């Protein structure tokens, strides 16, 4: 289990992470979303023990991460641009990983090699971006980590390889209880992969919820009133994230219980009333608007 307790990180005069508390349970796949510059990568590096938090602590299975080799030996961090030694081949990097990670499995390395179909003797600097990303997964999973932290891990991969890697991650979670933390701007990928989601903005954590709960708690309402004066009265009754008019129909994005929302609209006897589900991408956009992020260009 990963426990993030009131963690803050400051670079010069900029607060990259501000007092974040978060618990990620063993065997979960946690998706970290956020606006550009929200502090996602800083938080991931702090969880991985690369950065020392200026305040708060990161605890994994009851032990601190920073400057704790035993705990770090069970964590693998995959940055958005994987780093390999100059002129190194996949096999040479495997030798290095074997010397660093005590749980390295040569058997697992061999198994995964059959999936990725990369030549282990080939130099990594001669591979395409997508092939280097495959190599990064190959090496990371061969370390048999308890915690895998990934920053934009599927970027550059073709659809077939994306599906393969998702299946391997699901297998690791199901069979070994792997805990995975994924930061990505591809919300459809997060929606497919994750069972829990956090949304960051300007260094703060806005949302920390199970994905199913988040989707069931936010609704798109299309409504046409017989009397337009009713529109204003709803603001005091419901938590409205967004409202716009499309001809005679009004569109609302509302947080809360579905039946309570429907009842609040039915009071005014609308002649059109539909409650529709939202995708994670839509929820993200409207939550960002609620946090003051300018989404006007998106909605045009």
Q: PLM features: residue spans?
A:
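Short, flexible helix/strand-to-coil boundary loops that buttress conserved ligand/catalytic motifs
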Residues: 69, 215-218, 235, 265, ...
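C-terminal coupling/interaction segments
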Residues: 253-300
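Short, surface-exposed beta-strand/loop "edge" segments at domain boundaries and coil↔beta transitions
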Residues: 148-150, 228-232, 259-262
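ABC transporter nucleotide-binding domain
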Residues: 165-256
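ABC transporter nucleotide-binding domains
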Residues: 2-4, 9-201, 207
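A structural detector for beta-sheet-dominated domains
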Residues: 5, 25, 224-226, 255, ...
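Short loop/turn segments at beta->alpha junctions
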Residues: 89, 210, 276-279
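Short phosphate-engaging motifs
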Residues: 16, 67, 189, 230, ...
